[in-house]
Amino acid sequence: MRTFDYKKIAEYSWDNEVLSYVAKIHECKGRQELYLKQRPAELERLVEIAKIQSTESSNRIEGIITTNARLKQLVEDKTTPRNRDEMEILGYRNVLNLIHENYAYIPVEPGYILQLHRDLLKYTNLTYRGHFKTTPNEINMTLPSGERHVLFRPLEPYETPGAVEALCCTYQDVLHRELVDPLLLIPCFILDFLCIHPFNDGNGRMSRLLTLLMLYQNGYVVGQYISIEKAIAETKDEYYAALAQADQHWHEEENDPTPFIKYMLAVICSCYQDFE
């Protein structure tokens, strides 16, 4: 069984690229409060735009789509879903709203993660919503020949509850003791979450929602105004390439999370630059 211990991150020697990203984001966070006070009317408009973009982008990454007109109506609660895709889009909108409004009261714990997953798939009739996976879920790609190639084998279903519990415990412990900068800790958590792949469906969307939740809880609220999900969707190839590099030898606990950390820091940094 793979173990999780984020205290090790404190011992890493980070290169100048990582340190530069972290410093820039800290500077942006320092100016954040000033912008929030100076531009209330403009920020309200940005929030509504970001909600639509985040809902559309995070679902589009997974091939879940609808028309722009329908999307806007769904996000603004002016219509009901017509099909499975729209059910999942509406579920994402609801969880996104919940995180925006209540992030301070949603602990990063297995029970709450399960509740968010249940709410994500609330409008579907899927029996596994709100439950960890019950069958193995390989991450595959289809070759031009039509042959399926296994990219990554996540943990088995029987390992999943304990792994998510351990993941949450080490995250909370290291965060509480202030051993590691949250900007480094959060991408490590998300990488491990994706490698566990704890659900039958919805892992990618849950990872992006949890990213927002943890960023907001640590004072990085740019995602409320500039869509982080849109930034990821626009750099999807880089996203998957960073994941593929960072999950090598993950089962042996010899993987290097740096490529994924750099990718996520670049995304957060670009969102702050757009915000300013």
Name each region found by the language model:
Residues 1-276:
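FIC/Doc superfamily catalytic core
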